[in-house]
Amino acid sequence: MRLPVKSRYALLLVIASCIAFPAFAQNPLSTAYSRDPQQPVDQDYTAKIKQYTTAPNFNSPLTDYLPASKTVPTPAKVLGDVSGAPNILPYAEDVYKYFRLLAASTPRVKVFTIGHSEEGREMIAVAIADESLLAQQKENDARLAKLADPRTIHMDDTVAAGLVKQSFPVYYITGTIHSPETGAPTALMEMAYRLAVDDSPYIKYIRSHMIVLITPVVEVDGRDRMVDIYKWHLAHPGENYPHLLYWGHYVAHDNNRDAMGMTLNLTNNVLDTYLSWHAQVLHDLHESVPFLYDNTVGDGPYNAWVDPTLNDEWAELGWNNVGQMQNLGMPGVYTHGDFDTWSPGYLMFLAAMHNGISRLYETFGNGGADTEKRILGPDEYERTWYKPNPPLPVVTWSQRNNNNYEQTALLTTISYFAQNSQTWLQNYYFKSKRSIEKPSENGPAAYVIPDENQSASRRAELLRVLTLQHVEISRLSEPATVTNPAKKSDDAKSDKSDTKSEKPDAKPEPKTRTFPPGSYVIRMDQPYSRIADALLDRQYWAPDDPQKHPYDDTGWSFPDLFSVPTVRVTDVSILKAKMDPVANAGAPSGSVNGSGDIVAINNAGEITLLGLRYALKDAKVSIADAPFDAAGKHFATGSLIIQRVSADALAAAVKDANVQAVSLTAAPDVALHAAPVPRIAMMHTWLDTQTEGWWRVALDKLHVPYDYINTQTVSHEADLRSKYDVILFAPIGRGAPSMIIDGLPMYGNPLPWQKTDLTPNLTIDSTPDMRPGLGLDGLQHLKDFVSQGGLLITSEDTAQFAIAEGLAPGVFVNRATGVNLTGSVLGATFVNSKSPVAAGYGDSLAVYSANGLAFTIANTISPGRIQTEKDYHRPTGRGGPQDEDIPEGRNIVAPEPLPSPKPWEAAPLNEEQSRDNLFLIPEQYRPDVILRFASKNLLLSGLLEGAGQIEEKPIVVDAHYGQGNVLLFANNPIYRGETIGSYPLVFNAIMNFDHLNRPATK
């Protein structure tokens, strides 16, 4: 029976009230969290807590005091004041110093190094429990490992039940992944002290029944930069202070979107820690909305690949947590909200996709340690069914308030977790077991990556990501034949495919396929099948889904985005095929076949050829202008011919590039052009560096060197062409394109981003004032760079900037209406496969599109209206709708036929329109469309409504300006480490920067 919506909500609230305090059913709320009356209180510290808390109901009995200890230091030992005190933000090093003081003072605390950031800063995990539990940690971990992989106990529920009774859980808490969200480190410092020292019955129960594991600072590089910014702010009262331009070395807010691609150190360090401790929960602490939003419950749609038990755990923990804090009298605490739980890209979701429980708090914060008057908007303070006790509309908020809320929420929830630990461990086991049983229950049985002609480097990258996700990978040692049920229609095809329409009543037949030896198999009968399934499957978000505002990307299918053909197999016989486990799939394995002075490397859309060119910078490298056959192999257009290089240097470079080099007895009989080593600059603005950071990390990981410059540099550098061949201008993601020129408003004081004694961590780039933009001088310098033969590569908003400022003659932004798309994977078709940019590709490609941006092109520099056959509507006159009107009393003169261009083509001008037309672009300078959206099967994964507005429109265009080129991407080809399949579009262009000026395709 399906209850009405209001009834279901009421039922949820009833359930919440029932589960709020089952562990303390014997005790009224007033005693559930009572102190030990025999334990002394640190009166000075407690007085400061009261002083810095701006209203009594912004605290609770759990955090309105601090127990005293003669041997264990409080956070004040390092901070000089209590946690949450005004004007104090500790560096990560100081946070670590305190935790190590704790570990040195009590056997209930241990500190571990779990890795380092890209800039070499340490990340730690702190384990807190009774000394006896920590002493048993290895034995307990061995038991948890068996629950995590029930194959080790033969899937025996009885054995598992015994292990559950003997074991205690691990609850992993992470703080400050988002650097401007500053409160978690001090809250966790004080909470760790409480867990180690407090003798309140509920604390003692927590200590004796579970390990609390804490990583107080996840984004260590960004934390130290944020503290620098705050120190600058304190040293310059009354002045505007710089915004935090760089968080981590590469990305800012998107560091919490890396749980799929596993690109950043912090993601790998947290996942490895979570799995090596066999933790049951990963609870990530954030700051934004008032006063505390426990988005554990979240909103629909829920991720389609998680175990249903997790949905129940989210509901139980989230509603319980809110219920307890409501009963403690703290306003503005709620769950549900509008955060959909669809994307697995968030850090916390590492747990959800590895059989654990993902949780997240958003606590109100001020972006520093100031105490501020905060004025809320109606959407923040108005009451709704899931927010019956909303935040106050006007509030004086302090960092101490933040710490009170965060600690109270954590302490109540881990208390509930400890009291019900056997339930969570049992669920942990059953979720792991069902992951292994996936093939026989809901399927699929496996995913297979055939060992057929495809890009070795892209395939290796996909396998590497799966390996980082701790997914087991096997490889067929013999052929394997499977039969998959028929689909309603074939997977997305190129528009050039020759397909015949089926009769409406024709029944599609099951498909049988044989995979050759060497094919990779990702079995679904393994503990972490869910993350593999979520990444390798496709996603569909219905346009009429009740959730109208997706929180993040709606599609991410990795086989499409990596351009690695992968088959979803439901036939369980694949699991009986002969295969061997692969220990380090994706590791460098390129090799040179044969020996000789000339070698060829096929370009199958490899992502590593540009880096290979730099590794062999002294070699003679040429690029094939056409396909050729040599040494029994076929080589595509864009393949490399390498000469004058030592065998050792070649072998090392080829291995690292994960490609196969073939020795030739002579140079191939094919047209070649030289491949000079490009001089690259990566240009950023001082508006935002979030999205361009993904480009930098891709270049760095693929060993492509570049100079890192900014728009202010360009405004002062008149001769860019003497220094660079290519300038990359990645998406900005903030502000209108006009802000690239204008910069930030010049009101007030300068906003420096500089390394100084006061701000030693403000590095990566430098400026005395972040406000000035590119300016008109900088724009002219960019134009001069391109007109003198340089290549400017742009994407999304920087492509719109190039169009608006006249750098892309004949290219315009497609004005679409009614398109509903949020981070989806779309099909695309190559228009000019002869362009060097398209080298190594076939007819089609899957691309990531953030919002459906596309282009149109014209043969004129202004988008003048050229009437086409599609636009024509016949006038009133003789004949029917399809007939021509024939005036009376004269001979018939046939009109000039109206053009009928395709959506990706420019409308041709007739003689009348071309005569003495100063705006007509000469043919050799007309834009060249390389890639367009598909005309059918456009949506591959995610959400798309209004496809007709963007179908067949250009998305990658080579615009010609003077002697140079501006390459425009409507999509983002280098995004979150996920769009590996479109990387070569950028890299091909760079390698062929001086070979792009060819006539536009007709």
What are these regions, as identified by a protein language model?
Residues 10-22:
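Bacterial N-terminal signal peptides
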Residues 26-211, 251, 257, 263, ...:
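Intrinsic-disorder/low-complexity accessory segments
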Residues 212-264:
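Mobile, glycine- and charge-enriched loop segments
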Residues 1-12:
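Bacterial N-terminal signal peptides that target proteins for export
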